[in-house]
Design a protein with these regions (language model features):
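Structured alpha/beta or helical-core interaction and ligand-binding surfaces enriched in interleaved
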Residues: 2-176, 180-232
Length: 232
């Protein structure tokens, strides 16, 4: 496991937007340095209320952010030109996370571009693998075969984009869903249809101390996914 407080950025031109939401207080005051048994119990905990985490990530011991479901409006601001691209940031409970991601691909159209992201090799840093012009139905069929990897590997992320328009859906290594779109309504309807409520004060797990997890099997499966997609 490795600790991180950085947002995932599967595509170069679309980093996860930053929220101005006021921080929430942790549910408990916890000591700064837990003993081994207490830390093991914390890492084994996969559910907070009704929110189910996947194996990919855990909140830090201090619970800076308590995981919960919902989505918020946000925006990516181009640091060079100052232009704004509307965004949605969603935290989805594990039992419906993958199907929600797949549903969000529908508004992207019949053909998509794909960026896979890997942080498996710490020495190599963040690596990206791209595929342009894949049929969305073919992409979806392949992704269903790798559901376990994309849900449970804390070192894998994917971004799916419209080849011409500013439309992008990210499923990042924090297992958050991020949508970039000039018109958010079609994607927002999908999120509401999945039972998610809008809360613009929502803080997500990547905004606090957290830990990612991966293993050799996931790394091998990531390579298989890149091969199936024809990424380079």
């Amino acid at each position: 496991m490795s600790a991180s407080d950085q947002h995932s950025q599967p595509s170069d031109n679309a980093p996860l937007p930053q929220s101005d939401a006021t921080p929430e207080a942790p549910i408990d005051e916890q000591p700064a340095a837990p003993d081994g048994a207490a830390l093991d119990a914390h890492l084994a905990r996969a559910q907070y209320g009704r929110f189910l985490l996947t194996d990919a990530i855990r909140p830090g011991w201090r619970l800076d952010v308590v995981p919960r479901a919902g989505y918020r409006h946000d925006a990516f601001v181009d640091p060079a030109g100052g232009s704004r691209l509307p965004a949605l940031v969603a935290a989805v409970s594990g039992e419906t996370l993958f199907e929600t991601f797949m549903a969000l691909l529908d508004p992207l159209g019949d053909t998509c571009d794909v960026v896979l992201e890997s942080t498996h090799d710490e020495a190599a840093g963040r690596r990206e693998f791209t595929r342009s012009g894949i049929e969305r139905l073919v992409l979806e069929s392949i992704l269903w075969d790798f559901e376990d990897l994309l849900l449970n590997d804390g070192c894998s992320g994917i971004a799916v984009m419209h080849p011409e328009q500013s439309l992008e859906v990210q499923f990042d290594e924090h297992k958050l869903l991020v949508v970039y779109a000039p018109i958010r309504a079609p994607f927002e309807r999908i999120l509401r249809g999945q039972g998610l409520d809008r809360d613009d004060r929502l803080r997500v797990i990547s905004q606090g101390e957290h830990m990612h997890t991966s293993n050799g099997r996931h790394e091998r499966r990531f390579g298989e996914l890149a091969g199936r997609l024809g990424c380079c």
